[in-house]
Design a protein with these regions (language model features):
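Transmembrane beta-barrel architecture of outer-membrane proteins
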Residues: 59-61, 124-126, 173, 218, ...
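Short segments within alpha-helical structural elements
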Residues: 192, 196-200, 225-253, 303, ...
Length: 469
């Protein structure tokens, strides 16, 4: 085999050897387990996707609509397409290109520049294949840049998964807030009707001399209080509806949303968080931060390779002739092969500065990665604390609401039987309304906290991340 061919094969075999440091994942700066009793309850988050987590079919449908139509999410998903295209562009540099080329040239040479002393007109025509400049990646510069582009693409993809999970959580929480506002509004309407009935009864008793003006004013005050609370709850319901409509992103979003509160006590289910090590492997923002760290690690390889020679090849093969008609005549074959070697000798410290910059950027990415883990750990711990305490609070408030409801029934019977005063009955009405409202609020907050936990754990997203066109 010819020596030039052997040298070329050796160069190609060495191409792509990376000078990037061996990547090692930093140790997670968090504890190895969760310090919460709630960590042992519910289905494991690693086995739970959002369709299973959401029990209510209406809410599942709304989340699906939002995933298909939300504008902010669509923009995020299109960022994936940009990152994927950028990676493909960078990856193409690792493969020699080939293009067809044809050119013609016709020029006049003045007599004072001609060997014959007379002006002359010359022509040349060429057609063939051309090899654009191709770098032999002996020291892994192009490979490192390609690896960095790949990690940036994977980071963008993970960030998009995080955006999808965030949207699922936002829609779920907006829906839970809306459902809670509906339930409070329904309770207020029932309470107002009951208090208006009581006011009518007292008005009759007052006309008969069996009730005082004070009794009437007390009852009237409760009616006006209920009317004010009715407007407040109606406003909260409408605001929650507006937030949900915005998240859904469709013109007919309001028509898709149920107009009556759900009769199920729980619209979502309990989940168990698993271990912090599982969180690192599952949560998208942690994965995105690690991909950025890997990209910065690859950048060091590219910066190191800049200190070494760079060899590039260009060439062409085809036919040439002074006449266009002679391009394909025998003997018109032509070729060129132009290897180029570039070796940095003096660059005023540019390459050293680039290497220092790459190392500092990697250190910064390590700090960002560790900070992301700590933030995720804190969010999970906060969500576990909230779900644990709210679960017990919800049970206590349900028991309290049941008790005050029975008290109201007894107080009403005793008042109508003339055994107790009207004031005792009004106090029972007021106490029952306050405790029923508190139970609804706590129940809503508990489910919202479960959604926070679901998001903090990475959401159990199992679908492919693709842009909706």
């Amino acid at each position: 085999m010819h020596k030039p061919a052997c040298a070329l094969l050796l160069a190609l075999s060495l191409a792509g050897c990376s000078m990037a440091p061996t990547y090692e994942r930093p140790e997670a700066p968090v504890a190895s387990s969760w310090n919460s009793p709630a960590a042992k309850t519910g289905q494991a988050a690693s086995n739970l996707d959002w369709q299973t987590f959401i029990v209510d079919s209406e809410l599942r449908n709304l989340v699906g609509v939002a995933l298909d139509n939300n504008r902010s999410l669509r923009q995020t998903l299109l960022d994936i397409e940009q990152a994927r295209a950028q990676y493909r562009i960078q990856r193409a540099d690792r493969v020699p290109g080939l293009s067809a080329a044809a050119n013609g040239n016709r020029q006049r040479l003045p007599g004072d520049l001609s060997n014959t002393g007379s002006s002359a007109v010359s022509s040349s025509y060429q057609v063939g294949l051309a090899l654009p400049e191709y770098e032999l990646d002996l020291f892994g510069r192009v490979k490192s840049l390609t690896d960095a582009a790949l990690e940036q693409y994977l980071s963008t993809e993970a960030a998009a998964r995080s955006a999808q999970i965030a949207l699922i959580a936002e829609v779920s929480q907006a829906y839970l807030t809306y459902d809670g506002a509906q339930r409070r509004l329904q309770l207020t309407e029932q309470t107002l009707a009951s208090r208006e009935d009581s006011l009518g009864l007292i008005s009759q008793r007052r006309s008969a001399g069996a009730a005082t003006a004070l009794d009437y004013q007390e009852a009237l005050g409760l009616v006006e209080q209920s009317r004010a609370e009715l407007e407040s709850n109606a406003r909260q319901k409408q605001q929650a509806l507006n937030a949900l409509v915005l998240l859904l992103g469709t013109a007919d979003a309001a028509k898709r949303i149920p107009q009556l509160p759900q009769d199920k006590p729980m619209l979502i289910q309990d989940i168990a968080p698993g271990t912090p090590s599982e969180l690192i492997e599952r949560r998208p923002d942690i994965l995105a931060a690690e991909h950025v760290l890997k990209a910065r690690n690859a950048d060091i390889g590219a910066a190191r390779a800049a200190f070494f020679p760079r060899i590039s090849l260009t060439g062409s093969f085809g036919t040439s002739s002074a006449e266009m008609s002679g391009l394909f005549d025998g003997g018109s074959r032509s070729w060129s092969f132009v290897p180029t070697l570039s070796l940095p000798i003096f660059d005023a410290g540019r390459n050293s500065a680039n290497l220092d910059l790459a190392k500092v950027r990697k250190d910064s990415a390590v700090a960002a990665y560790e900070g992301t883990i700590q933030t995720a750990f804190r969010e999970v711990a906060d969500a576990l604390a909230a779900t644990d305490t709210l679960r017990r609070e919800e049970a206590a408030r349900r028991a309290l609401a049941n008790t005050t409801n029975e008290t109201l029934k007894l107080a009403k019977a005793r008042y109508e039987g003339g055994v107790d005063s009207h004031l005792r009955y009004l106090d029972a009405q007021r106490s029952n309304f306050v405790n029923e409202s508190a139970y609804i609020e706590t129940s809503t907050q508990r489910q919202i906290a479960l959604v926070d936990l679901f998001r903090a754990l990475g959401g159990g997203w199992s679908g492919e991340v693709t842009a909706q066109r």
